[in-house]
């Protein structure tokens, strides 16, 4: 998180007259990579056009095409397009910098796929730049996305598996592999994920969310990928664009969906455009460093000052992460096309948007609407990190907000539930409002949300302390959490390693980012253990690689979690059913998922004593239920007052009406 806002800001939104003063961090390390091979076109040289973005486009798209063209003095040129009917220049927009043009291109309905040529003319001289207009995949616009039927597996690629050691350190990229450093690059890559897709499928996951894979070429701490230096290229230490598309294809072959993590809010201070931005207000500029105040309530607080709102949405996320100005229509169009380009080019299934409330909310609503206009069934989940339920609900599209705002954001991350799970499960002698009652209380506020099915529920991710640490390294509590993730409303996300109770390396504390993002044992040649295999899990013991369980416990946790999520895949009553829950008693919690055909009963004993299930308390829904099956054992289950549930354990029973 960034530091409190500094004084002396320029208050206007369109700050075109100020001198751009940059922190010098990382600019020297920025490398500008041409978007094409200049040798491929004899009369186009790299000093005339250094890049054109988007890199390509398609016929049959709803989004009008606007090309960002960069080249020294390019604004002095006229632009036309040749190569066939149906593709033409509609308008040429000049920027503040003479080294950019924004060219509006019409791709008519009769345009044919193929290579066209952008012709740049000046003083009787001209040169050409090849540009591909491809045919869309059949059914691309109607593509499906992640839903309540999915379980999402979150991977931090640098820490998952190293499938290609040859790209660990790359010339021109100063941050080299250093596996002994918690904030260094460890060498995980796209090939490593491809190599372990079977493990992910075996766990029961149906979708993968990777933290950003696009280029982050700052001098240090680049492993996380959240400071982009080139939006259209995969970081070479992870692979390349073609390998990323292969990864998506191979995942689809195994019925795994791919969700891309994107960050329109901020770019790296070493991004290629920072040496010469198209417009003076391309990003938010202050006379001294000004971080966001992170007061998200200013977006919906009727009493908030404009000053506080401005600093919240315009302040920088970090000194190395500049805040993009989405109020500039060319910036907004850039990010709309960029998102659509990756969906179409790589065949993506969803987006996770980082730091969603940091953005200017109205342009981001337009961004969401543009993506949904192109792909009506596409899903986007936004990271709106707040434990205030009304504030969280405000960001979900379709909500009847008093100010009339509609984000068009379909899905949100359930941070209130995340915090309630972690706090409640470790309170063995709870007072009023504590223990498992915390979870009951969170669900009692479900009336606030517009669409409960589009809630991402999660017990941990790459930004929060390891689940194993939060639950005090108690595997029974981990099992309770996994059972709740598999049976509650919404769709679950599990952070890689939590299914094995990874813990932080505790470099400073359990919440330290470098420490909690531990390497997955078995992902590197020479690792002492391989937790990707059943044999490796069975033999796993305490070590220094983020695992702290007795021998055999890793296998037990994995098998428990895998069984649950494999079972969940086909349970429509979980995906789309209603919920009925009952007030907690003695740190126990009972809830039912039900529809016209099926009922699933979940009983959580979070106490330190065995408990008899109070069936009469649940008569409203349980009366008459017969022929139950214990989900974990497959054995028949009958309602009986003699049923005892062990301390810190969970019972799941399914019935057919």
How should each PLM-predicted stretch be described?
Residues 160-345, 364-374, 379, 384, ...:
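Substrate-binding/active-site clefts of carbohydrate-active enzymes
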Residues 163-181, 185, 386, 452, ...:
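Loop/helix patches that line or flank the sugar-binding groove of alpha-linked glycan CAZymes
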Residues 28-29:
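C-terminal motif of bacterial Sec signal peptides marking the signal peptidase cleavage site
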Residues 34-76, 129-138, 142:
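Beta-strand/beta-sandwich contexts
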Residues 133-154, 159, 163:
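Low-complexity, Pro/Ser/Thr- and charge-rich linker/hinge segments at domain boundaries
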Residues 61-124:
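Immunoglobulin-like IPT/TIG beta-sandwich domains and homologous Ig-like subdomains
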Residues 374-460, 519-539, 548:
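Glycan-recognition surfaces
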Residues 638-657:
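C-terminal beta-strand-rich structural cap/linker in extracellular carbohydrate-active enzymes
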């Amino acid at each position: 998180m960034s530091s409190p806002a500094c004084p002396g800001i320029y208050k206007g939104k369109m700050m075109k007259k100020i001198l751009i003063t940059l922190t010098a961090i990382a600019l020297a390390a920025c490398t500008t990579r041409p978007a094409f091979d200049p040798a491929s076109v004899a009369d186009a040289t790299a000093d005339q056009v250094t890049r054109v973005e988007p890199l390509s486009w398609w016929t049959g798209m709803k989004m009008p095409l606007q090309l960002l063209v960069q080249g020294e003095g390019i604004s002095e040129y006229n632009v036309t397009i040749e190569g066939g009917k149906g593709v033409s220049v509609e308008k040429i927009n000049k920027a503040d910098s003479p080294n950019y043009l924004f060219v509006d291109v019409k791709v008519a309905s009769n345009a044919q796929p193929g290579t066209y040529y952008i012709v740049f003319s000046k003083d009787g001289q001209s040169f050409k730049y090849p540009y591909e207009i491809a045919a869309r995949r059949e059914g691309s616009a109607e593509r499906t996305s992640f839903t309540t039927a999915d379980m999402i597996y979150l991977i931090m690629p640098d820490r998952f598996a190293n499938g290609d050691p040859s790209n660990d350190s790359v010339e021109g990229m100063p941050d080299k592999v250093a596996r002994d450093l918690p904030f260094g690059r460890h060498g995980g890559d796209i090939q490593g994920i491809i190599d372990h897709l079977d493990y992910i499928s075996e766990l029961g996951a149906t979708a993968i969310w990777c933290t950003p894979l696009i280029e982050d070429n700052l001098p240090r701490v680049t492993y996380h990928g959240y400071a982009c230096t080139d939006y259209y290229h995969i970081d070479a230490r992870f692979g390349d664009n073609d390998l990323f598309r292969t990864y998506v294809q191979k995942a689809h072959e195994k019925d795994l969906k791919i969700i891309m993590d994107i960050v329109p809010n901020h770019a790296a201070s070493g991004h290629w455009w920072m040496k010469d931005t198209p417009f003076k207000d391309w990003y938010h500029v202050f006379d001294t460093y000004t971080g966001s105040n992170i007061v998200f309530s200013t977006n919906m607080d009727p009493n908030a000052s404009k000053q506080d709102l401005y600093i919240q949405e315009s302040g920088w996320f970090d000194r190395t992460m500049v805040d993009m100005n989405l109020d500039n229509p060319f910036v907004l169009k850039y990010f709309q096309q960029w998102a659509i380009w990756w969906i179409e080019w790589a065949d993506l299934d969803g987006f996770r948007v980082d730091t969603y409330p940091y953005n200017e909310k109205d342009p981001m609503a337009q961004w969401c609407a543009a993506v949904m206009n192109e792909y009506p069934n596409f899903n986007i989940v936004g990271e709106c990190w707040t434990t205030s339920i009304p504030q969280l609900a405000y960001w979900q599209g379709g909500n009847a907000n008093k100010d009339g705002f509609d984000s068009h954001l379909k899905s949100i991350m359930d941070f209130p539930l995340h915090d309630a799970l972690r706090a409640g499960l470790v309170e063995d002698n709870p007072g009023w409002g504590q223990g498992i009652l915390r979870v009951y209380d969170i669900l009692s506020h479900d009336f606030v949300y517009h669409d409960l099915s589009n809630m991402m529920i999660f017990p941990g991710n790459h930004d929060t302390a390891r689940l194993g640490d939060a639950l005090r390294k108690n595997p029974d509590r981990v099992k309770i959490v996994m059972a709740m993730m598999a049976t509650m409303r919404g769709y679950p996300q599990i952070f890689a390693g939590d299914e094995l109770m990874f813990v932080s390396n505790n470099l400073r504390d359990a919440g330290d980012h470098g420490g909690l993002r531990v390497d997955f044992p078995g992902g590197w040649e020479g690792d002492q253990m391989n937790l990707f295999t059943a044999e490796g899990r069975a033999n796993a013991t305490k070590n220094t690689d983020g695992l702290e369980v007795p021998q055999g416990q890793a296998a037990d946790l994995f098998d428990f979690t895998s069984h649950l999520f494999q079972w969940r895949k086909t349970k429509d009553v979980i995906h789309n059913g209603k919920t009925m829950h009952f007030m907690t008693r003695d740190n126990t919690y009972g809830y039912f998922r039900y529809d016209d055909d099926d009922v699933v009963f979940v009983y959580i004993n979070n106490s330190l004593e065995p408990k008899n299930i109070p069936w009469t308390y649940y008569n409203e829904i349980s009366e008459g239920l017969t022929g139950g099956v214990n989900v974990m054992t497959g054995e028949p289950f009958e309602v009986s007052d003699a049923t005892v549930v062990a301390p810190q354990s969970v019972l799941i029973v399914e019935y057919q009406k």
